[in-house]
Amino acid sequence: MSSDTGPATTATPALAVEELVAGYGGVIALDRVSISAGTAAITAVLGANGAGKTTLLRAVSGMIRPRRGRVLLDGTDLAGRNPEQMVRAGIAHVPEGQAVIPELTVEENLRIGMMSWPRGRSRADRSAALDEAFERFAPLAARRRKLAAALSGGERQMLVIARALLAQPRVLLLDEPSLGLAPRVMAQVMDLVVRLSREHGITIILVEQNARGALAIADHGVVLNLGRVVAAADAATLAADVALRHHYLGF
């Protein structure tokens, strides 16, 4: 395993996590974790169950408060802010589990994504943003007034990503977006992730159990084990490291 164990870095990282320590009660789930993600790049965060991947996203998004360390967005330290403040700063989080509100329609679910907008934004701005969301996620347009409970797993995943994008983030945190999806739908979701990065300039932190698929689309990768970074490099280097793959990634 020859991969560099320092953080995957770029010349101008949009998001940098420095020496982050976080946990639950007396359990330390992240131990001095440092990573960075370049503007409009995809950074895959990989590792076995319990490695600390989801905790990392929760700490970055404000769902849990780090015990130590910094979360820098364009150089500004946001560590310790709550989720609403993180969204307003430009970080949106899509947790695993396709967490739609089933009793609301597709459009009503999407409107929740605009709750962080300043009060001065006009109704026309909101309508235009919704139209853009339905154009970008065409399968949702035909179900605009259907209850979210009626959507398939793939459509629900599209909905939660579309809702997060309506907050107009610079950084998008995706936790297991392919979980439970059929291979064809999973490929569509991965293609969407690439387009968000390449065409819309969004910096993406992608947590995935499907390490092979994540490295295939990522620019950089970080491997966690027991709350620590054990490898970080460009995605091609990690994918080519046979010992690393077998030991930590399962392929």
Give, region by region, the residue ranges found by the protein language model:
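ABC-type ATPase nucleotide-binding domains, specifically the catalytic core motifs of the NBD
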Residues: 25, 43, 81, 106-128, ...
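The feature captures the beta-strand-to-loop junction immediately N-terminal to the Walker
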Residues: 46-48
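Helix-to-loop junction immediately C-terminal to a conserved catalytic motif
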Residues: 61
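Conserved ABC transporter NBD signature motif
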Residues: 69-77, 89, 126-130, 233
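Conserved ABC ATPase signature
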Residues: 147-151
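ABC ATPase C-loop
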Residues: 164-165
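Helical segment within the ABC ATPase nucleotide-binding domain
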Residues: 187-201
